[in-house]
Amino acid sequence: MENKWTDRTALLLGEDKMSRLSNAHVLVVGVGGVGAYAAELLCRAGVGELTIIDADTVNTTNINRQLPATHSTVGRLKTEVLAERLRDINPEIRLHELPMYVEAPLLSPQGGKLQSEQEDENEFSRDVITPSALLDKLSNVPEMSSPHGGNVGGRLFIVDAIDTIAPKCALLGEALRRGIPIVSSMGAGAKSDITQIRFADLWDTYHCGLAKAVRTRLKKEGLRRSLPVVFSTEQADRRAVITVEGEQNKKSTAGTISYMPAVFGCYLAEYVIRKL
């Protein structure tokens, strides 16, 4: 009998679990340091359908920690590089690559969406998309839609690996409002102690500036709901953080080490596999 590449996983998890993984659809938003590792581990575990979204290209400064980043891939889309790896691992995977940025919706002074945003938000041809438009689009594609109808609250699971506050909170808020399962990564930068990485509810996190900012934003939106996250209890090394100018949604850059984002990605993948 010919060996299957999933045999060792099936030996551990059992055929029923493997069937659930094969029929699952996971959306990974952000495939840099954390998200790319999560996506690859989900693929290797046998998740049958993945959507990866990120408009970034590989930069030399990514090489120290990001799975898609090598000297030969500098300048290429991270989604493109990662997709090649995922298809080489599982040639039968149902894989959707979206080289786009997820952005918070534009608001008018009265608090509603701007007209241009209302008209264009469902177009995948743009390089920017709101979480609402993204999830609406996924729910309207037959092979991605929920078996229960309506939005994609059935078999879809979301992995949030966005590292900027506004789009991150927009995605989290949309998922929470729709009741779509989601797990989120908090900050791994300026930290190096692998033993302090934890799972927790967002509202129980500490020593994490990103988590604090996310809590504040969601609370203002009336979304004080349970949200599983991976974070580190280690206090950030302030000496490893520098201010930057001219970068969208970014005021600072933190020093990083190779293994921290990878382990955050491991935690996210394990959570999804356990919950599916």
Where are these regions (language model features)?
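Short amphipathic alpha-helix with an adjacent loop that forms part of the alpha/beta core around
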Residues: 106-107, 130-138
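Conserved S-adenosyl-L-methionine
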Residues: 44-49
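Hydrophobic/small residue at the entry helix of a nucleotide-binding pocket
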Residues: 34
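N-terminal charged helix/coil linker that caps or initiates catalytic domains
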Residues: 1-26, 60
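Glycine-biased, low-complexity coil/linker segments
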Residues: 111-112, 149-150
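Glycine-rich phosphate/adenylate-binding loop
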Residues: 2, 153-154, 164-167, 182, ...
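Glycine-rich phosphate-binding loop and adjoining beta1-alpha1-beta2 segment
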Residues: 54-89
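Conserved SAM/SAH-binding loop
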Residues: 99-106
